Amino acid sequence: MIVTTTDVIQGAVIDSYLGIVTAEVVYGSNFLRDFLAGIRDVIGGRTGSYERLFEQGQRKAIEELELRAQRLGANAVIGIEIDTGTINVDQSGVLLLITATGTAVRVR
């Protein structure tokens, strides 16, 4: 499966556009990680645990995007965009949302 952020694949011809595919990954907050990240925010520095979480989430979202594209008969996904956001859940915390979107295509 070819996955790319571009709208074309060099050397390939798009035979058919199969539709938009979207995949979401949601992570719940973790009290200890959030507490330690808050301390780092105050004293400065990077929060490695959140960086790793974002990296993992992006990989998972792209993997799910590939699976959904394969179900449509695609062998490539073009124009991939990854968005991140948070969802506030009352007083209990925040959910991290990572969304990947692209166009499933059949190429030769």
Curated annotation (Swiss-Prot):
* Gene3D superfamilies with a match to the protein in the record: Hypothetical protein apc22750. Chain B
An example of a Pfam family matching this protein is YbjQ_1
**Superkingdom of the organism of origin:** Bacteria
**Which family does the record assign?**
Belongs to the UPF0145 family.
Species of origin reads Trichormus variabilis (strain ATCC 29413 / PCC 7937) (Anabaena variabilis)
Q: Which HAMAP family match?
A: UPF0145 (MF_00338)
For this entry, the protein name equals UPF0145 protein Ava_0420
Cross-referenced InterPro entries: UPF0145_dom_sf, UPF0145_YbjQ-like
**Range of residues in the leader sequence:** none
